[in-house]
């Protein structure tokens, strides 16, 4: 899985956008993604985690997480990065040392992390393992992982000043919601930012799932939605923006050179 954007805080720069400056439509924010497995970046395809292989990218050599993270953020002119910890998501131990190394190497990074958190306590435990750098971690709470409605409410009740501590990801695969806690039906408990994750579109060159995006938007029109999966080229980003997406999580199209570098 992989996995919306947050406005500028202090001196940190915003991720840049692919956008026509003459347009009055809000620009699309690109959030680059890395999928981490056993200490390296792998290529995600259709959410079939057991078949993932080390990334091969036009942007950099090798699959070292720091090298790949820097290349993606430079290409997107972004200080925001999403990471899916596949070790944790497949029942293993979260890669705290790898996450810490990325944060230490990129001191301006706002790091969105999905490690299959079942509850707020699990997220806090990973923060403690990462150490002081975890102040820059934005926790992703995914509908496929959250265990109860009570935990859904608890995860987004905690705040850091005026900043929400996490983002909700609404997950589905092949038309079926991955949602043991019933998150999809509880928009009153959603945070201000929600990811719409269609797993079979991830790395599949299949186009974005705009129907599901519109379905979620209808449930909560004021929520900032971030799509995930399916982007093939810049025209897909335009269509996603027109459908109401605030941002999109992207990996394969960046590694394959199908999206141009973002410039100021």
Map each language-model feature to its residues:
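Alpha-helix-loop-beta-strand connector modules within alpha/beta enzyme cores
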Residues: 92-115, 155-166, 205-227, 231-232
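Glycine-rich phosphate-binding active-site loops on the catalytic face of alpha/beta enzymes
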Residues: 132-151, 198-203, 230-236, 243-263
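Hydrophobic faces of well-ordered beta-strands that scaffold small-molecule active sites
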Residues: 29-34, 81-83, 111-115, 139-141, ...
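Short catalytic helix/loop segments, enriched in acidic residues and glycine
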Residues: 48-70
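Short linear motifs in low-complexity or flexible loops
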Residues: 3-5
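N-terminal active-site wall of soluble small-molecule enzyme domains
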Residues: 72-75, 79-130, 210
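Conserved anion-binding
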Residues: 36-53, 121-202
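Catalytic cores of alpha/beta
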Residues: 111-133, 186, 213-220, 225-247
């Amino acid at each position: 899985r992989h996995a919306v954007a947050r406005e500028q805080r202090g001196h940190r720069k915003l991720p840049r956008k692919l956008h026509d400056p003459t347009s009055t439509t809000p620009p699309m924010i690109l959030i680059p993604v890395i999928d981490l497995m056993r200490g390296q970046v792998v290529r995600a395809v259709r959410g079939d985690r057991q078949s993932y292989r080390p990334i091969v990218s036009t942007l950099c050599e090798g699959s070292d997480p720091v090298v790949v993270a820097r290349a993606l953020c430079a290409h997107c002119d972004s200080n925001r990065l999403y990471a899916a910890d596949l070790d944790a998501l497949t029942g293993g131990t979260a890669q705290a040392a790898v996450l810490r190394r990325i944060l230490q190497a990129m001191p301006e990074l706002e790091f969105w992390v999905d490690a299959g958190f079942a509850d707020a306590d699990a997220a806090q435990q990973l923060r403690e393992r990462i150490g002081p750098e975890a102040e820059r971690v934005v926790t992703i709470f995914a509908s496929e992982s959250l265990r109860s409605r009570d935990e859904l409410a608890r995860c987004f009740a905690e705040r850091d000043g005026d900043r929400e501590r996490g983002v909700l990801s609404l997950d589905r695969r092949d038309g079926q919601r991955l949602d043991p806690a019933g998150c999809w039906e509880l928009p009153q408990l959603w945070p201000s930012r929600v990811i719409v994750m269609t797993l079979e579109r991830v790395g599949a060159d299949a186009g974005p799932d705009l129907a599901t995006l519109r379905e979620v938007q209808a449930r909560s029109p004021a929520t900032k939605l971030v799509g995930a999966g399916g982007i093939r080229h810049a025209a897909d980003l335009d269509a996603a923006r027109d459908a109401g997406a605030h941002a999109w999580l992207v990996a394969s199209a960046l590694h394959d050179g199908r999206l141009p570098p973002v410039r100021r």
